[in-house]
A protein has these predicted regions:
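Nucleotide/phosphate-binding catalytic cleft detector across ATP-hydrolyzing
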Residues: 1-71, 83-92, 96-183
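Short beta-strand scaffold segments in enzyme catalytic cores
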Residues: 76-80
Length: 183
């Protein structure tokens, strides 16, 4: 599948793609690192870097001081940065899947429908109060992981941060200014 995607992209671009970097959840290198490397190399790439996901996101964001918080499908990964350098990375099992499970229970929907409902921006205002306890759990994870560090700003990334208003709840609960990219 990845090789087919690579070939399709090469055809569209009119050039051969030789190099690739990949990202994995923090702390999973021993479990996921080898598998991801095999997939990337199996597709015909030379792997140039294997980074944890929040650190990879910061390659684009260029945050100098603060924490990049990757609220993904199953986990929340946090990279703490000081002077542009990662000084701590951690990951905990709470993410978008948990949001979907709460919605499935609250609205008596199959998980797959709850997932679609969650992603539809027109539903965000309605579902935010239902999801607030899970968002506050994410905020408590963040607070615990950044304890003892001088974090002046939180920068949200990952699919789950597309939920309208999530940054306000996290900012209020942590007491730290919280930002997310335009979605």
């Amino acid at each position: 599948l990845v090789r087919e995607m690579k070939e399709e992209l090469e055809e569209k671009l009119g050039t051969e793609l030789l190099y690739a970097a990949a990202a994995i959840p923090p702390g999973t290198d021993a479990l996921d690192g080898g598998a991801i490397k095999n997939v990337v190399q199996g597709a015909g790439f030379e792997i140039t870097a294997l980074l944890d996901e929040p650190t990879a996101a910061n390659q684009i964001l260029k945050i100098q001081n603060g924490a990049v918080v990757d609220i993904g499908g199953g986990t929340t990964g946090i990279s703490i940065l000081e002077n542009g350098k990662v000084i701590n990375v951690d990951d905990e099992a709470t993410g978008g899947t948990h949001f979907s499970l709460v919605l499935a229970g609250a609205y008596k929907l199959p998980f797959s429908e709850a997932e679609i409902y969650k992603r539809d921006k027109k539903n965000h205002k309605e579902i935010l109060p239902v999801l607030k306890p899970v968002i506050e759990k994410v905020a408590s994870i963040i607070s615990r992981q950044i304890e003892g560090y001088n974090v002046q700003g939180l920068y949200l990334v990952g699919g789950t941060c597309c939920l309208s208003g999530i940054e306000d709840i996290i900012g209020k609960k942590t007491g730290i200014p919280t930002y997310k990219p335009e979605n």
